[in-house]
């Protein structure tokens, strides 16, 4: 089993990172800290004639690294009943990747992966994390 841990927190050694370290203790993983990369927000052009245009950032490199693994652990703080903005930007860009010739069968390949979520919240995290998990 090959595991990629995708960290969505901007805080170095914050609560999300500390809890995730307990979860992955003893496992061999590749750690991907989204905060260390430039990920532009999606410019949604799914329904335009020209479609998506190339974006000059680090996103494609991150997708390539992630897709080498068969299991993903998404680690994120809970902000306003959802994932961090950093994580959201990364996942939103998947819409672009599903139409990118550099990543043929991206959606199909995602369907073969296992995914887990480590979500860290302050007050009432079970209630506030529910919308994230139900998405």
Say what each PLM segment does.
Residues 1-104:
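N-terminal beta1-alpha1-beta2 submodule of the flavodoxin-like/Rossmannoid cofactor-binding fold
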Residues 103-135:
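Short, glycine-/small-residue-rich phosphate/pyrophosphate-handling segment
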């Amino acid at each position: 089993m090959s595991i990629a841990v995708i960290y969505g927190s901007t805080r170095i050694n914050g609560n999300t990172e500390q809890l995730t370290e307990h979860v992955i203790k003893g496992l061999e993983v590749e750690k991907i800290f989204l905060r260390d990369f430039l990920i532009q927000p999606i410019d949604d052009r799914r329904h335009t004639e020209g479609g998506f245009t190339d974006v000059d950032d680090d996103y494609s490199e991150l997708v390539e690294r992630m897709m080498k693994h068969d299991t993903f652990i998404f680690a994120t703080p809970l902000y306003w009943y959802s994932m961090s903005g950093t994580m959201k930007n990364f996942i939103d860009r998947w819409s672009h990747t599903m139409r990118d010739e550099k990543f043929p069968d991206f959606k199909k390949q995602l369907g073969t992966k296992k995914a887990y979520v480590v979500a860290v919240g302050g007050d009432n995290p079970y209630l506030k994390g529910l919308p994230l998990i139900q998405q």
